[in-house]
Amino acid sequence: MRSSLVLFFVSAWTALASPIRREVSQDLFNQFNLFAQYSAAAYCGKNNDAPAGTNITCTGNACPEVEKADATFLYSFEDSGVGDVTGFLALDNTNKLIVLSFRGSRSIENWIGNLNFDLKEINDICSGCRGHDGFTSSWRSVADTLRQKVEDAVREHPDYRVVFTGHSLGGALATVAGADLRGNGYDIDVFSYGAPRVGNRAFAEFLTVQTGGTLYRITHTNDIVPRLPPREFGYSHSSPEYWIKSGTLVPVTRNDIVKIEGIDATGGNNQPNIPDIPAHLWYFGLIGTCL
């Protein structure tokens, strides 16, 4: 009897101490793949200065599912506002989507070298929250324009799903933008790939439970960028994390993705191993390489 009780409490403690892991459905896997391609398309220079109504295309087979859907541009922007925010707003009639895609940094090494760790209050998004100064300032500088563009698209297509997405810096911008516009009554899902931490623990907790859409935070093996800025500077990651455990240049399958729950959970990308830059460029294919 005593040994049974000991085993029970040990098992219970282990369950509490360890992050909860679950696999993803085939439908969600397909969405991860599609929005990774929308994120990849934002790196293609011609897609950031494209006339409205033209089709989204990519070099190097970076976005075949987007091309197959005959997605078109509603609006594109390049080097806008603070931090040279770049990307596009797209209409996908095949999948009934309105997609805002933010481009990531052109040079990962330079971005890491110039990364600042300053946090600023963002109480207009959530009480007690502090966000990365660069990410929040960049979003604020283009928010009015993009808010209006999204609003116009939703008015024209009220039954379409709204998705914000991006890789690296683009994922950080998509996360902040989604949190901000949900507060204005929009239903927005966010798919971020290899995104850095965007704020303090209060902000991470808010992102975890915020209504009006879902945040899908996807990471890959030991990608260096999701480990920045360091937790020692007051930063935290939201829950859950969808961690791709297969290696760089290895095709990703549904069984390679693990859903890990818990703010700042360990066992996914957040492990005590050597971080890797090439891992940052492989999310369901090469991402960030379209010119």
Curated annotation (Swiss-Prot):
Matches recorded under PANTHER family: FUNGAL LIPASE-LIKE DOMAIN-CONTAINING PROTEIN-RELATED (PTHR46640:SF1), TRIACYLGLYCEROL LIPASE, PUTATIVE (AFU_ORTHOLOGUE AFUA_6G06510)-RELATED (PTHR46640)
Biological processes annotated in GO: lipid catabolic process
How does the annotated pH dependence read? Active at alkaline pHs (up to pH 12 approximately).
Q: CDD domains per the record?
A: Lipase_3
Keywords linked to the UniProt accession: Cleavage on pair of basic residues, Disulfide bond, Hydrolase, Lipid degradation, Lipid metabolism, Signal, Zymogen
Q: What is its EC number?
A: 3.1.1.3
Recorded protein name is: Lipase
Q: What is the effect of changing residue 168 to A?
A: Decrease in liposome binding
| Mutagenesis or variant effect for residue 111 to E/F/G/L | Altered chain length specificity
> Which residues get removed as pro-piece?
18-22
* Active-site residues, as the UniProt record annotates them: 168, 223, 280
Family that this chain belongs to: Belongs to the AB hydrolase superfamily. Lipase family.
Q: List the disulfide bonds.
A: 44-290, 58-63, 126-129
Q: How is it used?
A: Used as a detergent lipase. Sold under the name Lipolase by Novozymes. Engineered variants are sold under the names Lipolase Ultra and LipoPrime.
Q: Tell me where the signal peptide lies.
A: 1-17
Q: What class of enzyme is it?
A: hydrolase
Name the domain of life this protein comes from.
Answer: Eukaryota
Record Pfam families: Lipase3_N, Lipase_3
* Catalyses which reaction(s): a triacylglycerol + H2O = a diacylglycerol + a fatty acid + H(+)
Recount the entry's temperature dependence annotation: Active over a broad temperature range.
Q: Which organism is it from?
A: Thermomyces lanuginosus (Humicola lanuginosa)
**GO: which molecular function terms?**
triacylglycerol lipase activity
